[in-house]
């Protein structure tokens, strides 16, 4: 049985999964894409269900490899693109698509902030208010 590290990366446009051995050798890799919706100019959203679906499809593809039965997942590393709030209801069900970092709909609000408010936001969150970043 070969111990492996399974790395799962959720990027802006897709999910990549890499299988690495204890020496750092890449044994296998697979990826799949998911869509972004742009219902209005400047908007950019994704359905969390698409992330889950694509990840499972990519993992299923890797499990079809003939060497898979000889691998034991010893560690799992996961990462994602910057940030995105997944809003849930009281039953932990997703209630709307996730607004992703490329969304620019809040540009007018960011531009309308007075200098003191902008400075306060920076002092508290160490970032300037821009449409790209969620406030802390």
What do the PLM-derived regions correspond to, one by one?
Residues 57-136:
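Glycine-rich phosphate-binding/catalytic subdomain of phosphoryl-transfer
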Residues 31-71:
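N-terminal phosphate-binding loop and adjacent alpha-helix
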Residues 16-19, 53-56, 78:
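A generic N-terminal leader/anchor concept
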Residues 1-3:
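Non-catalytic pre-domain segments flanking phosphatase-related domains
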Residues 5, 10-48, 93-101:
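Short glycine-rich, Thr/Ser-proximal phosphate-binding strand/loop in the N-terminal lobe
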């Amino acid at each position: 049985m070969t111990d492996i590290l399974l790395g799962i990366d959720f990027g802006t446009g897709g999910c990549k999964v890499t299988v690495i051995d204890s020496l750092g050798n890449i044994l296998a890799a697979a990826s799949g894409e998911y869509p972004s919706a742009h219902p209005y100019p400047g908007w950019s959203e994704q359905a969390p269900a698409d992330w889950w679906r694509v990840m499972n499809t990519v993992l299923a593809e890797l499990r079809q490899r003939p060497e898979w039965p000889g691998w034991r997942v010893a560690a799992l590393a996961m990462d994602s693109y910057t940030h995105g709030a997944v809003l849930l209801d009281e039953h932990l069900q997703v209630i709307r698509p996730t607004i992703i970092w490329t969304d620019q709909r809040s540009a007018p609000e960011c531009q309308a902030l007075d200098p003191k408010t902008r400075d306060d936001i920076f002092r508290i969150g160490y970032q300037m208010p821009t449409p790209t970043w969620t406030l802390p």
